[in-house]
Amino acid sequence: MWTHPISYDVIVVGAGHAGCEAAFCSAKMGASVLILTSNLDTIAKLSCNPAVGGIGKGHIVREIDALGGIMAEITDRSGIQFRILNQTKGPAVRAPRAQVDKQMYHIHMKRLLESTPGLHIMQGTVESLLDKENVIQGVTTKEGIAYLGKTVILSSGTFMRGLIHIGDRSFSGGRLGDPAATGLSAALKERGFPISRLKTGTPPRLLASSIDFSVTEEQPGDPGVGFVHRDEPFVPPLPQVSCYITHTTEKTKEIITANIRRSALYGGRIEGIGPRYCPSIEDKIVKFADKERHHIFIEPEGIYTQEVYVNGLSTSMPFDVQYEMIRSVRGLENAIITRPAYAIEYDYVHGNVIYPTLESKTIEGLFLCGQINGTTGYEEAAAQGLIAGINAVNKVLRKPDFIPSRQESYIGVMLDDLTTQVLDEPYRMFTGRAEHRLLLRQDNACLRLSHYGRDLGLLSKERYELFEHQKQIIEEEKLRLSKTFKKYGNSVVSLAKALCRPEVSYDTLREVFPEEVRDFGSILNASLEMEIKYAGYIERQKSLIHSLSKSENMTIPEDIDYQSISSLSLEAREKLAKFTPRTIGSASRISGIANADIQVLMVAVKKHAHK
């Protein structure tokens, strides 16, 4: 084993969405960084759907941008369709989503990482960890090289003992066409990490020229919608395309029902649990037997390829069944499959062995982020990469931990959930996971979090000043509109009061009063509308957070002995010792911890402070 002569502050293992974000932000904060990946040609590869964002997920991408991360920027550069979902619903659940060109996403990300000062990229497959007395020292690779580092970030995706299933055929792989990583799982198990299996899947890819789009429903994008917070209209750099909607038929249902036992999922060959909200088509047919048809979304994979992603037809059926199944769908009667669908099982680490900083409780200086923590989705992975990278650098520099709270961000909600809950399925972000989602809208992420990005050195002075200017605009416009009176309908009211009417939006008000109602761009317009229209609800939520903050943020001493607190229930003592929460708020969200236990714990914490 040859030891590389350069030692690094941060070593990142894996160059998926978590790894890229971790490596970039670490280098941006001034650390020397090495990112190791088994294939430089698959950096930031979109292994499943060619899309970024969506409900909950789009909120996270905007938060990453507000903190100084890169997913939003790369998405805007690579996007071939942009939309705002749930436009007719409440403001808390409206979310940006983009179809992206898979190749361009990879190219832009690789180019950005290669040009980032202090960041080195190397092809290599990590097989084991180097540690001494439970402190990380570095990693070793299959190629026979040892790399030394003060901190290590594992972002292995679905590669840890990945096992691909297509019907009755199963074979090792991190994704179709790429080898699995087998040594890393063994290295973690040897060091006492609790590991289990999860499962995910992907649909087949089809040749667009073989599809009859005339019988499908076209789904165009929305103009002027991007992910990066900016002060000018967004103009996508790439040509924009449409997606298309079709549906399964009665014949589809018959084919799946007749072959259900040939599915790897229903044939008993898969032990891992899949994501509840992204089920395979056979799962949908079985669990929703009374439903006549299921929607299928045809999504282009790029502007330089004919391949399309068939969203809604994820399956682990054998290829011959996939062939029949595809051709039973309206518009796909003559479709040509370019890549088969498959399911994949992989190892993940239980959340009770990581802190909310994403540092391991077992080995100091070792951080975990992405699917290795049991999450699913590019966006959840990227956010964890950002947090792991920030805290790895803070550890090297001996600076305080950075843990955004669940009251101020979806990233905080996710960190809290991952470290206080026992996962029984892959974790996916939804707006419903947040208690104060009206405060955590996608349009106000920069207003909530940009001060952290500035303090961490991730946001430039120019971008931070832009966000501060936007805050000022909102406050000034709220006041001005409240003092500007016009006849609207049958009465004279302030424009702020008019905007509070359910049927009135900022854009409709601007059309009626173009001189008085100014255009600040889609994101800022949305923020201004929500701040005025829902002012009462927003103030009530802020008041509630303030009243709960004292107990929520009460710190639990690291050396507290839960077993000695006899008034705690036995289950509470076991769960608290297992998860070792850092605050009373986190402790209260551990399954099995009753309100009475929290009251006892608060008394014990106060007594401990006076020792």
From Swiss-Prot:
Location, primary (coarse class): cytoplasm
Keyword presence, Flavoprotein: yes
Membrane-spanning intervals of the chain: none
Residues engaged in binding NAD(+): 274-288
Listed cofactors: FAD
Pfam families: GIDA, GIDA_C_1st, SAM_GIDA_C
Localization: Cytoplasm
GO aspect biological process, one term: tRNA methylation
GO cellular component, one term: cytosol
Single GO molecular function: flavin adenine dinucleotide binding
Signal sequence, start to end: none
Binding site for FAD: G14, A15, G16, H17, A18, G19
Keyword entries, A-Z: Cytoplasm, FAD, Flavoprotein, NAD, tRNA processing
Annotated InterPro entries: FAD/NAD-bd_sf (IPR036188), GIDA_C_N (IPR049312), MnmG (IPR004416), MnmG-rel (IPR002218), MnmG-rel_CS (IPR020595), MnmG_C (IPR026904), MnmG_C_subdom (IPR047001), MnmG_C_subdom_sf (IPR044920)
Domain of life: Bacteria
Family: Belongs to the MnmG family.
Subunit (UniProt): Homodimer. Heterotetramer of two MnmE and two MnmG subunits.
Function per UniProt: NAD-binding protein involved in the addition of a carboxymethylaminomethyl (cmnm) group at the wobble position (U34) of certain tRNAs, forming tRNA-cmnm(5)s(2)U34.
Protein's UniProt name: tRNA uridine 5-carboxymethylaminomethyl modification enzyme MnmG
Phylogenetic lineage: Bacteria, Pseudomonadati, Chlamydiota, Chlamydiia, Chlamydiales
